[in-house]
Amino acid sequence: MFFGTFNHAIDAKGRTSLPAKFREALAAAGEPRIVLMQYPHWRAVQALPQSVWNELVKKVMEASPLDARWQRNVLKFVSSAHEVDLDVHGRVLVPPPLREWAGLQKDVVWVGMGRTIHLYDRAAYDEQMSAEIPADQVVDFFRTA
């Protein structure tokens, strides 16, 4: 599982270090690579362990090819996916289309989201986090059914 927020830089070639805690979690789970794709709700890159990606692909393959809404989502987001390996320094190379989608500049933020990881441009992340969540949209994680 991935938790926490980590500030890093991304270089001109699109390389950025995956936080050590995330690398350790991947290694402990026997996950040698990650899959990067567009995050559908914000301009961010979503990083998924290979096993989580495989679950997603299985669901996609079970969908009807006649479901236009589903197919549009597959075309838009799943087709943006790139399998990437970490280099010997623990860095990932974020492909140019994903860097452009997320507006990744120099300063980036890795955010652990449980089973997945998000990668944001620092300015966009700060803006998103400074916005208040309307009271009717706040989720009570501790409420019992």
Swiss-Prot record:
The UniProt record lists the SpoVT-AbrB domain at 5-50, 81-124
Q: Which GO terms describe its cellular component?
A: cytoplasm; nucleoid
| Source taxonomy | Bacteria, Pseudomonadati, Myxococcota, Myxococcia, Myxococcales
Instruction: Name the source organism.
Output: Anaeromyxobacter sp. (strain K)
Q: Which HAMAP family match?
A: MraZ
Entry's localization field: Cytoplasm, Nucleoid
Q: Does the keyword Transcription regulation apply?
A: yes
* Entry-linked PROSITE patterns: SPOVT_ABRB
What name is this protein filed under?
Transcriptional regulator MraZ
What keywords does the record list, in alphabetical order?
Cytoplasm, DNA-binding, Repeat, Transcription, Transcription regulation
What is an example of a GO molecular function annotated in this UniProt entry?
Answer: transcription cis-regulatory region binding
Q: Which Gene3D superfamilies match?
A: Transcriptional regulator MraZ domain
